[in-house]
C-alpha cells in the first residue's frame, strides 16, 4: 500500500490500559516495543519530525499505558510500556505484560510491531522473548537497532551480526540501523512501516 503521509500532522490521541479504551475505528496501527530507555520516545519524535511529541524521560519505565499517536488521520503509532525495568514491582510488570499481550494478540488494527533494540548491546532476555512472541503469533516485525550514532560506523556490521545471532533473526524480517541524532535509518524505517500497512 502506498500512502502519502504528512508526518507533521501528528498528535497523541489517547492513552489506554485495556481494549475498552482503544480507539474504535479501523485505522492501521504500528506498535513500538522495546526495553526501557532503548529510545522509543526519541524514535517517535524523529519519525514524526517533532521535538517532544513523545516525552523522552531520563527515568525508565515512564510509559505505563498504551499511548496511541494519530498520524495524519491515516495511521497510528502505539507506544507500549518499556519492559525490563527493574525498579517496578513484579506485580506491576505482570500487569503491563498482560496489557501488552492483550493488545498484540487481539487488536485487529495492528499491522506490525517495530521492536527496538540498542545497537550497542546484545539483546536482553526480554528482547529475545518479545521477538519469539511476535514470531509465534505470526505478527509482522521490524527490528530497529537504535543509538547507531554511539558506535563507529565501521563496527555497525559486527554489532548487527551479534544482535541477529542472539535473536535467532529471521532474514525475511526487516532490520534497520537507526539514529535519532543523525536521522540515519529514518527513510528505511518509514519504507518498512508503510509496506506493512
Swiss-Prot record:
Requisite cofactors: Mg(2+)
SUPFAM superfamilies: P-loop containing nucleoside triphosphate hydrolases (SSF52540)
Xref: Pfam families: MMR_HSR1
Binding, GTP: 34-41, 61-65, 79-82, 146-149, 178-180
CDD domains, alphabetized: YihA_EngB
Listed GO MF terms: GTP binding; metal ion binding
Residues reported to bind Mg(2+): 41, 63
InterPro entries named among the record's database cross-references: G_ENGB_dom, GTP-bd, GTP-bd_ribosome_bio_YsxC, P-loop_NTPase
TM annotation in the entry: none
Role according to the record: Necessary for normal cell division and for the maintenance of normal septation.
PANTHER family: ENGB-TYPE G DOMAIN-CONTAINING PROTEIN, MSS1/TRME-RELATED GTP-BINDING PROTEIN
Official protein name in the record: Probable GTP-binding protein EngB
Originating species: Streptococcus pneumoniae (strain CGSP14)
Gene designation per UniProt: engB
Amino acid at each position: 500500500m502506498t500512502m502519502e503521509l504528512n508526518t507533521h500532522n501528528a498528535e497523541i490521541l489517547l492513552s489506554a490500559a485495556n481494549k475498552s479504551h482503544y480507539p474504535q475505528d479501523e485505522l492501521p496501527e504500528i506498535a513500538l516495543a522495546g526495553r526501557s530507555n532503548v529510545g522509543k520516545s526519541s524514535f517517535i519524535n524523529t519519525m514524526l519530525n517533532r521535538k517532544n511529541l513523545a516525552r523522552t524521560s531520563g527515568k525508565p519505565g515512564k510509559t505505563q499505558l498504551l499511548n496511541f499517536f494519530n498520524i495524519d488521520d491515516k495511521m497510528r503509532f502505539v507506544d507500549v510500556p518499556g519492559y525490563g525495568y527493574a525498579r517496578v514491582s513484579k506485580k506491576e510488570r505482570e500487569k503491563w505484560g498482560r496489557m501488552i499481550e492483550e493488545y498484540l494478540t487481539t487488536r485487529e488494527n495492528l499491522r506490525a510491531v517495530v521492536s527496538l533494540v540498542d545497537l550497542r548491546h546484545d539483546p536482553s532476555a526480554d528482547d529475545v522473548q518479545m521477538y519469539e512472541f511476535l514470531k509465534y503469533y505470526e505478527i509482522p516485525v521490524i527490528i530497529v537497532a537504535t543509538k547507531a550514532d554511539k558506535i563507529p560506523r565501521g563496527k555497525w556490521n559486527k554489532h548487527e551480526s551479534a544482535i541477529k545471532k542472539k535473536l535467532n533473526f529471521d532474514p525475511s524480517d526487516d532490520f534497520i540501523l537507526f539514529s535519532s541524532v543523525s536521522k540515519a535509518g529514518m527513510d528505511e524505517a518509514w519504507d518498512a512501516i508503510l509496506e506493512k500497512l
